[in-house]
């Protein structure tokens, strides 16, 4: 019946009305129901696939960010030269004194301050040199000079160095949860 009405109207463009199109498609509205269901299922599958891709992409970004952070930490340590944090040096001196059973800690610190170069570099990386008396002890790094190396034996420095490197290597290991694959 829709075809008859469309012929009478001389193709006036009303063929595209919903009522006429539904009648021409078949008996009732059942003609498009399967198409709508299939289209909805395809859209849901595409949405799930997109969600999986986004989750995998985020996982890969996290892995890359963690790896980059650890590589930056390693490169900072490798490029810094021979620099020991001031508290590490003092702890090594205190430990040596306790092993030798020598004088008190205060005598060691005052003697150590007299023999140190007197310059420290703040951890923020600024190039200004300051004395031990004006710089805070918690955030300073002391350059290792020849009078300092005479106090600390080479064996202790080698142990300290190997402990630091072992800790860096243990912290820089990345355990991936599975094979890194990207579906195309």
UniProtKB/Swiss-Prot annotation:
Component of the GSE complex, a GTPase complex required for intracellular sorting of GAP1 out of the endosome. Component of the EGO complex, a complex involved in the regulation of microautophagy. It is found in: Vacuole membrane. Residues 92-112 have a biased composition (Basic and acidic residues). The lineage of its organism: Eukaryota, Fungi, Dikarya, Ascomycota, Saccharomycotina. The modification Phosphoserine is found at residues 146, 149. A lipid is attached at residues 7-8 (S-palmitoyl cysteine). Keywords: Autophagy, Coiled coil, Lipoprotein, Membrane, Myristate, Palmitate, Phosphoprotein, Protein transport, Transport, Vacuole. Residues 89-147 are annotated as: Disordered. It comes from Saccharomyces cerevisiae (strain ATCC 204508 / S288c). Its main location: membrane. Component of the GSE complex composed of GTR1, GTR2, SLM4, MEH1 and LTV1. Component of the EGO complex, at least composed of GTR2, SLM4 and MEH1. Residues 30-71 form a coiled coil. This is Protein MEH1.
